Regions:
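Signature of multi-pass transmembrane helix bundles
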Residues: 11-37, 49-58, 83-240, 398-402
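Juxtamembrane helix-boundary/capping and inter-helix hinge elements in multi-pass membrane proteins
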Residues: 37-38, 70-80, 108-109, 153-159, ...
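Membrane-water interface of transmembrane alpha-helices in multipass transporters/channels
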Residues: 43, 79, 83, 201-209, ...
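Short amphipathic alpha-helical coupling elements at transmembrane boundaries
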Residues: 45-56, 163-178, 244-251, 267-271, ...
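Hydrophobic transmembrane alpha-helical segments of multi-pass transport and channel proteins
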Residues: 54, 90-94, 98, 216, ...
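Small-residue-enriched core segments of transmembrane alpha-helices in multipass membrane transport
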Residues: 85-94, 172, 208-225, 244-252, ...
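Transmembrane alpha-helical segments and their short flanking loops
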Residues: 112-113, 300-402
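Helix-loop-helix junctions within the multi-pass membrane cores of secondary transporters/permeases
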Residues: 252-330, 395-402
């Protein structure tokens, strides 16, 4: 009886999980797409576009809330500590994004598919209506205001503003977890049906498995090499350090949420450093911002889609602007399923000429691959305090000597 109940709970969790729902949406579109009336497809596309418009309308507030909270909680107002932490997060994310660019180009022979325009319908699917909401302000404005107010709060040690920042971020997290994420399958459905209508979905679906294999390989190589370098190629230390992070990685894989793994990750990271308080301060500060898995995955997916769409590789100068924008936008991301890609869609659209359909595809791909990305994020965050401790201790010695 207990076994039956346990199996029921397990299967119930699977059925209600986001990846299962998204896979179901894709299967429904593939199998029943041709039987769905075109007017219904157009209506569902209109709903998807309207949800996107609503998201873009409130996105500056979402970005502001997470940036404000992230910077307000940093280092208890210690400016030097904060600047070092910010610099290391930016450099780490930037290096990962650049590596992903070259990895994407090298692996395109495995990933990329040339779209046969003769295999698609000549008639495109147009929405019945669109919800065109004005934007409150540019996303950059929300980001800059959040960073500025957060730093001011941290430096001045304003407890009331810290509490406000946390409540604001908690409210935003509730909106994402309880409103936006549950309607993600509906959000995706309209774009998927449009792809099915034009015949592009079948072509794209063939590409998922090779892309996933390349992505997992990239995560494994990058993070493995990072641990080896930091541990001076001491295999035993690498195994011990990574083994300590495994429990947090399992939680992250199953929940697709870095935030959900935060308590376990903090406990795990403490085992890998000498200064336990340092790790306990760093992990909550970087959990939503320093995401190596995302920094490798999103550019890889974005470049692959760009090549499929435009039959060309984005110029490095264009990609460099995207990389900088990516690093800045990461300060506004949430450690919830789909949190990063939500704030990255405007960056992709403005820097890499992403269309609404491409945005819908990468959102779907990101959610499907999110367990692997989150696992990589957690291993990356487990390594971060080790690197930070080395640099921070060296900096303190230099300061004392001078």
């Amino acid at each position: 009886m207990v076994t039956i109940f346990t199996n029921f709970v397990r299967y119930n969790k699977i059925i209600h999980s986001l990846p299962f729902k998204l896979i179901l949406v894709i299967i429904v579109a593939l199998i029943f797409g041709n039987f769905i009336p075109e007017v219904l497809k157009a209506f569902l596309l209109s709903v998807s576009l309207s949800i996107k418009s609503l998201l873009l309308f409130i996105l500056p507030l979402i970005i502001f809330s997470f940036a404000f909270c992230s910077f307000a909680q940093l280092s208890n107002g210690l400016l030097t500590f904060t600047l070092l932490l910010l610099s290391m997060m930016c450099v780490s994310n930037f290096i990962a994004v650049l590596c992903s660019y070259y990895a994407a180009i090298i692996s395109q022979s495995i990933i990329a598919v040339i779209i046969d325009t003769n295999s698609t319908h000549a008639i495109s699917l147009e929405p019945l209506f669109e919800l065109n909401l004005p934007r409150l302000c540019d996303n950059t404005v929300g980001l800059v205001l959040g960073i500025a107010l957060g730093l001011y709060t941290s430096i001045k040690k304003l407890l009331i503003l810290k509490q406000i920042a946390k409540k604001f971020a908690d409210t935003t997290n509730k909106f994402l977890n309880h409103i936006f994420i549950p309607i993600l399958p509906l959000f995706i459905l309209g774009f998927i049906l449009k792809l099915q209508h034009t015949g592009a979905l079948t072509i794209l679906f063939k590409n998922f498995l090779p892309l996933l294999l390349v992505l997992i390989s990239l995560h494994f190589l990058y993070i493995g090499c990072a641990y080896l370098i930091v541990m001076n190629f001491d295999i035993k230390r690498v195994i011990i350090a990574m083994r300590n992070i495994v429990p947090a990685a399992i939680v992250g894989f199953s929940t697709m949420s870095s935030a959900a793994a935060l308590p376990i990750l903090t406990i795990s990271a403490v085992k890998n450093v000498k200064d336990h308080k340092l790790a306990q301060t760093i992990i909550p500060s970087i959990i939503n911002t320093h995401m190596i898995g995302d920094a490798l995955a999103i550019p890889l997916m974005a470049i692959s889609l760009y090549i499929v769409k435009y039959q060309a590789t984005p110029e490095f100068s264009v990609y460099l602007v995207f990389a900088i924008s990516y690093v800045l936008a990461k300060f506004a991301a949430a450690g919830v399923p789909g949190g990063t890609i939500i704030v990255m869609i405007p960056v992709l659209e403005s820097n890499l000429q992403f269309t609404p359909e491409m945005s819908g595809i990468i959102l779907m791909m990101y959610i499907l691959f999110d367990p692997f990305c989150t696992t990589a994020n957690i291993f990356g965050n487990g390594l971060f305090p080790i690197v930070f401790e080395k640099i921070w201790c060296s900096l303190k010695k230099i300061t004392k000597l001078s």
